[in-house]
């Protein structure tokens, strides 16, 4: 099973953990990462994560996120197909970076796109299952 995590998801452990929902999303995301390390899930990476990480003002956080690139089974760069698909996705109200990341995940054939961004979770995106890490684990546990 292949998963693509967006920048919000990768950054969740570095967010303020005061709210229970943030702590739960963090734990779920860390569980997914452990399954990636163990080879149970495959991590899909895209140029968008490289781009967004470059703007992270916290160097340590950026470095920790970028280490995950070495565990990715595939890394997708910008292409005409991705640009075209991203343009279509932007019509749903997605920002360019988010639309490009989704387009990459779809072209990579990722099974799931994981995000903690509520605005993205509420978009009618087709071609890939979009879940927050908690709901992903809930659906994954039910499928076992």
How should these model regions be labeled?
Residues 2, 16-26, 91-92, 106-144:
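Acidic, PIN/NYN-like endoribonuclease modules and their adjacent C-terminal/linker elements
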Residues 41, 45, 49, 55-57, ...:
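Anionic, Ser/Thr-rich low-complexity intrinsically disordered regions
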Residues 29-34, 62-66, 102:
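Short amphipathic alpha-helical segments and helix-helix/interface helices
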Residues 33, 69, 86-87:
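A generic alpha-helix structural signal
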Residues 73-112, 116-118:
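Active-site neighborhoods of divalent-metal-dependent phosphate/nucleic-acid chemistry enzymes
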Residues 4-57:
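PIN/NYN-family metal-dependent endoribonuclease catalytic core
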């Amino acid at each position: 099973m292949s998963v693509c995590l967006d920048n919000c998801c990768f950054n969740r452990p570095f967010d303020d953990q005061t709210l229970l929902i943030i702590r739960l999303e963090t734990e779920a995301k860390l569980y997914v990462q452990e399954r990636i390390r163990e080879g149970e899930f495959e991590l899909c990476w895209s140029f968008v994560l490289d781009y967004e990480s470059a703007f992270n003002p916290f160097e340590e956080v950026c470095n920790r996120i970028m280490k995950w690139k070495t565990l990715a089974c595939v890394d997708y760069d910008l292409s005409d197909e991705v640009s075209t698909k991203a343009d279509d996705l932007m019509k749903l109200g997605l920002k360019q970076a988010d639309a490009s990341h989704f387009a990459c995940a779809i072209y990579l054939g990722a099974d799931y796109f994981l995000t903690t961004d509520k605005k993205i979770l509420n978009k009618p995106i087709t071609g890939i299952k979009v879940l927050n890490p908690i709901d992903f684990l809930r659906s994954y546990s039910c499928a076992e």
